[in-house]
């Protein structure tokens, strides 16, 4: 019985490690590039709200964030520096400057 339990824990540990290995970790000071059709918002709250509207299929409400310049499209071939990471959201700035506050984007937009 103890052997079976040990095998179950070993398999569960390997499964968890493989999932973690597939999910690339983004860290502050890392240089990143964004995928096509990515966007960033002036605050994490604005990003959360825009993502909520996007996932709900509410295109007009989401578009209002872009019309008011609360969210902007990010170029896919530019380098950005990660300032801060909160869950799956990253605060980023242009890699060429030393700003300490920037825009927020979801890590699903980052090229791996």
Q: Model-derived features: where do they sit?
A:
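Bacterial N-terminal signal peptides that target proteins for export
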Residues: 1-7
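Repetitive helical segments and hydrophobic/amphipathic motifs
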Residues: 11-13
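N-terminal signal peptide c-region/cleavage motif recognized by signal peptidases
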Residues: 16-18
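SH3-family beta-barrel domains
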Residues: 22-65, 74, 86, 109-112
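SH3/SH3-like beta-barrel superfamily modules
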Residues: 25, 72-107
